[in-house]
C-alpha cells in the first residue's frame, strides 16, 4: 500500500513556483497585475503538475530525492515548451538554466531542511 505525502509538500512546492515568478518580476523590474502573474506562472504550474504525476512525486516510496530532481528538470522542460509554443514570451536557454537552478535549490532545499529536522527529532526521541 502506498502512502501519500503530506499535502503541505505540494503547497511548499507551489510556494517555490510562486516565489520564482515574483522574484523574476522584481529582478527584471516588471510591472503588471494579476494577469501578468498568471501568464507567467501557468506554464510552470502545468509543467510541475504534469512532471509530478509522471514521477509520482507526492506518493511515498523509494528514491524521493531522485523523483524530486526529475520533477524539477521535467517540469521546467514542459513549462518552457508550453511557454514557447502557446505564448508570445521568449524562452532563452539561460532562462531555463535559471529556472532549473532556482527550483532545484528551493524545492530540494526545503526537503533537505525537513529531513534534517526529522532526523534530529528522531535522535532526540531515542
Q: How would you describe each model-predicted region?
A:
Residues 2-37:
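Membrane-helix boundary elements
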Residues 8-9, 104-126:
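Membrane-water interface at the C-terminal end of transmembrane alpha helices
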Residues 18, 43, 70-81, 102:
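Small-residue-rich segments of transmembrane alpha-helices in multi-pass membrane proteins
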Residues 19-28, 46, 50-58, 78-82, ...:
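Alpha-helical membrane-inserting segments
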Residues 30-32, 61-62, 88-90:
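Membrane-interface helix caps and helix-loop-helix hairpins in membrane proteins
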Residues 34-46, 96:
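Structural signature of hydrophobic alpha-helical transmembrane segments
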Residues 56-74, 93-100:
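Internal alpha-helical transmembrane segments of multi-pass membrane proteins
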Residues 82-98:
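Membrane-helix boundary connector in multi-pass membrane proteins
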